[in-house]
Amino acid sequence: MEKKLPRIKALLTPGEVAKRSGVAVSALHFYESKGLITSIRNSGNQRRYKRDVLRYVAIIKIAQRIGIPLATIGEAFGVLPEGHTLSAKEWKQLSSQWREELDRRIHTLVALRDELDGCIGCGCLSRSDCPLRNPGDRLGEEGTGARLLEDEQN
């Protein structure tokens, strides 16, 4: 006897998307308010999502995890046709746009880690070796904050 596969629903409720994607329903509404995802309304005016929203939510979660702002995610999604299901090739192109920003952040974090034990050019002059690294607070003339680290970021 042949087993029938369960029918896959074309449209999902917000609760189903939330459960499957691991985000709160309120997050889905927020993403929608920012134009990152779209829903349709049924006859009872309830939101329904196409299944491809699961991929978009997964991309949003990954991008947020690596520190990509929602505005940047929105810009990347903005070039795609509405309701378009993202292919693996398109995901690769999309993620490559964020690679440079991610590399910059990694470089900054490595520099911060490596400088934690040394002077960061903050102008405090409280460490015994600050007069050697920052005599007379010369870095203060360049601006405020941790000048040695901030200069590396720019």
From Swiss-Prot:
Query: Which parts of the sequence belong to the HTH merR-type domain?
Result: 11-79
A Pfam match is MerR
Record: residues binding [2Fe-2S] cluster: 119, 122, 124, 130
Question: Keywords of this protein's UniProt record, alphabetized?
Answer: 2Fe-2S, Activator, DNA-binding, Iron, Iron-sulfur, Metal-binding, Transcription, Transcription regulation
Positions of transmembrane segments: none
Q: Where is this region: Might be part of a sensor region?
A: 119-130
Q: How does it assemble?
A: Homodimer.
Protein name as annotated: Redox-sensitive transcriptional activator SoxR
Q: Which organism is it from?
A: Escherichia coli (strain K12)
This chain is encoded by the gene named: soxR
